[in-house]
Structure formats: structure tokens, C-alpha cells
Regions:
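Mature, function-bearing regions of proteins
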Residues: 1-283
Length: 283
């Protein structure tokens, strides 16, 4: 199979996640799991909407309700730029500056920032445990933890856990204590699902596609968004399709060139973008 003589994986196994986390995440996002990193990142962001405080702020800004596609593209561009270029490059520093400026325009509790950060560690890891073409190594799991911890420090997030399992437990406890239905969450989640389906389906067919998106959401998310539980057959179909994809990918030749999402075309920027202009326009 593909991973038995895989150069990127062999390199990962030589790296120290405490200091080589940027290289580990670059290999994950651009070589090993570009599809899975993108999809699980979407699910991580989606998961944060289940916290009423986060959903209410996003609804208040109007970014996810009036400019859903642009807000998605902006998030994708900023995160992809950091993944692909590194923290201390000009592009990486500009991306952090844009992100911090946008966040700094609002009063966001530290515990919400901590939780959002945690989702970008543990949601991708759980996704790849289920749907990845190979298991993640311990170096990759810890590398993602240390990477996001350093990202959190650069975002001025306080009380960052030092331990992988401690942060995971914080994330699980936070969801248990804070996930709840809110009208804002329902609205934002609904618009995002419509956006996802709009990439593939004409408007009149989108209601038929909704159960397939619901199939990717767990029970706490469905309840928080006020969405119905999808039929088991659809959940099974989605699961089988993603696992079949993973099996097929495992037999493909290894990627020779990195897949750079920040260089791809974006619906909101058909003529291209300037990184220092990406994001919300703040007064």
C-alpha cells in the first residue's frame, strides 16, 4: 500500500513534534491529507457554531449570514497561508495580523477562543481516525497540538494547556457544558449548509442534499442547530463513501508537489486577492 514506502511519512517519523510542528503540519496539509485537512477544518469551524455565545457574535457581525461564502473564503485563505508559509514568513505574519485585527475588533471571551482553537486540533484528528487513508502517527497528533498551541500564543490566547490530553478534556468538557440550541446557531449553520450544497447542486435540489450533510454531524451538533436526525441509511452511505475514498487514496502514488489551497481560485475573489485586504472591512 501507499504508506509503506512513503517519503513524507518517513520524514514525519524523524521529526520532533515539540519543535518541528510547522513542518509536520505542512506535510499533513499539503502532501498527506489535503482533502481531509480541508474537510475536517470545515467541520471544526462548523462545530463552534453550537456554542451560543460564539453563534450570537457571528450572527451580530453579519459575516456568516450576509457574506457566508466570503467569510468561508477568508478563513480558508488566512489559515492556508499560515499552514503553507510558516509563522514567521512575511505571508504568515500578515495572515496573523489580519486575523488578530479582525478578532480584536470584538470582545471575545478567552474561554471561547480557547475552545475554537481546540476544535482545530481534535476535530481533524478524529476525522482522520475515521476517514483518513492511513492512521495518524503520534508525531502528527502532537505536532498539530503544539502547532495550534503556538498559533494560540500568537493570537494572544491566555491559559493555553501544556498537555495534549488536558486540552482535549477541556474541549470535551466545554462542549458538554456549553452546547445548546440558539436561533443564531440554527441560522448560521443553515446558511453554511446551503453554501456547501450550492457548490454542487442547483437550488431546487439542495433540500435533497441536506440529510447527507446532517449525516456528518453528531447528536450534540444536531440538537444545537435544531436539525433533524438523518435516516440511518444515509449516515451509513456517507460513512461508506468516505471510507471507500480513503481506501482508494491509499493505493494512489504519493503526491509529488504540495497542494496549496491559498493559491487556488476562490469564489469571492475571482480576480485574485491581496492578503492584507482579506477579511472583514473594519472601521
Amino acid at each position: 500500500m501507499r504508506h509503506t514506502k512513503h517519503k513524507a511519512l518517513q520524514e514525519v517519523l524523524t521529526l520532533d513534534p515539540r519543535k518541528d510542528y510547522e513542518r509536520i503540519v505542512y506535510l499533513l496539509a499539503c502532501y498527506e491529507f489535503p482533502f481531509d485537512v480541508a474537510r475536517s477544518g470545515e467541520m471544526a469551524l462548523f462545530r463552534t457554531f453550537a456554542v451560543p455565545g460564539i453563534a450570537n457574535l457571528l450572527h451580530h457581525t453579519g459575516e456568516f449570514t450576509h457574506r457566508t461564502q466570503k467569510r468561508y473564503d477568508d478563513t480558508d485563505l488566512i489559515l492556508s497561508t499560515i499552514f503553507e508559509n510558516g509563522f514567521d514568513t512575511k505571508a504568515g505574519r500578515t495572515a496573523f495580523s489580519r486575523m488578530n485585527k479582525m478578532h480584536g475588533h470584538y470582545i471575545i471571551p478567552n474561554h471561547e477562543m480557547l475552545y475554537v482553537l481546540s476544535t482545530f486540533i481534535y476535530v481533524p484528528i478524529r476525522w482522520m481516525e475515521r476517514f483518513g487513508w492511513r492512521p495518524l502517527t503520534e508525531q502528527e497528533k502532537l505536532g498539530l497540538f503544539y502547532y495550534m498551541r503556538e498559533a494560540g500564543r500568537r493570537m494572544n490566547i491566555k491559559e493555553l494547556p501544556n498537555d495534549y490530553h488536558e486540552f482535549e478534556q477541556f474541549s470535551l468538557d466545554y462542549e458538554r457544558d456549553n452546547f445548546a440550541y440558539s436561533g443564531a446557531a440554527h441560522k448560521i449553520a443553515d446558511l453554511n449548509i446551503d453554501m456547501f450544497l450550492g457548490w454542487f447542486l442547483p437550488k431546487f435540489l439542495r433540500p435533497l442534499g441536506r440529510p447527507f450533510i446532517y449525516a456528518l454531524l453528531d447528536e450534540p451538533m444536531l440538537k444545537s442547530f435544531g436539525f433533524p436526525r438523518p435516516p440511518k441509511i444515509i449516515v451509513d452511505l456517507v460513512t461508506v463513501a468516505l471510507k471507500l475514498r480513503a481506501k482508494l487514496v491509499s493505493f494512489l502514488p504519493e503526491r509529488k508537489k504540495p497542494l496549496l489551497r491559498s493559491k487556488g481560485s476562490k469564489r469571492s475573489y475571482p480576480l485574485g486577492h491581496k492578503l492584507d485586504e482579506v477579511g472583514t472591512k473594519l472601521s
